[in-house]
């Protein structure tokens, strides 16, 4: 009798486990497939903007700690993928490329960063502008990509999703496995051509002009 009860309990536990885990596994599978279809500029490229700004402005105006804050701000908007994992619809204001990619969000992050201006060895105004441009550049670069939905760049004043008229950056999948197995080389080549080279070239030109004028 004890053995029969044990077998019944085991079957019951297995049934309950399947009932709970199957929907979760299905949701996880749908989430993973959705991430594979989403297009963004890659996490390797968003930090190029704050690095280029730092090169152009020089160490006297942009300290290494502030550069680190700018790099963090440049990739921060893509934390909205956590919402996708939790079931937030892509097209929602709180979905991917929603409010976190807006100018208002960038301004809010920049204001928060000014609280640590002394720690970054920078003025509050300098901290605000550097972090704002670093974070706002994320949505701008995403508007240059060739796939996915547009960007709610002007949220909350407009929930329209925008792309720029010219879209030249090959989109990166948010799936890490797919990025390294399928799209990575093509995406990085595109970003090198359209983001890295222009940004860094402009940065070194501005730096050279500043040094020339300082003599």
Region annotations inferred by a language model:
Residues 4-6, 10, 19-22:
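Short hydrophobic alpha-helical segments enriched in small aliphatic residues
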Residues 14-20, 25-215:
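N-terminal membrane-targeting hydrophobic helices
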């Amino acid at each position: 009798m004890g053995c029969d009860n044990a077998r019944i309990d085991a079957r019951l536990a297995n049934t309950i486990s399947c009932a709970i885990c199957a929907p979760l596994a299905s949701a996880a599978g749908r989430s993973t497939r959705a991430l594979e279809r989403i297009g963004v500029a890659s996490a390797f490229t968003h930090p190029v903007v704050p690095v280029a700004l730092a090169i152009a402005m020089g160490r006297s105006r942009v300290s290494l700690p502030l550069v680190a804050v700018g790099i963090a701000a440049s990739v921060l908007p893509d934390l909205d993928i956590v919402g996708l994992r939790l079931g937030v619809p892509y097209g929602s204001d709180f979905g991917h490329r929603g409010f976190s990619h807006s100018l208002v969000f960038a301004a809010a992050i920049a204001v928060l960063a000014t609280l640590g201006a002394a720690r970054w060895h920078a003025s509050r105004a300098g901290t605000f502008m550097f972090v704002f441009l670093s974070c706002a550049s994320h949505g701008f670069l995403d508007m240059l990509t060739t796939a996915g939905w547009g960007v709610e760049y002007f949220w909350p004043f407009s929930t329209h999703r925008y792309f720029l008229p010219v879209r030249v950056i090959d989109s990166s999948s948010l799936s890490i496995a797919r990025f390294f197995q399928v799209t990575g080389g093509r995406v990085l080549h595109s970003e090198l051509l359209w983001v890295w080279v222009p940004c860094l070239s402009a940065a070194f030109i501005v730096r050279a002009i500043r040094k020339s004028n300082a003599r």
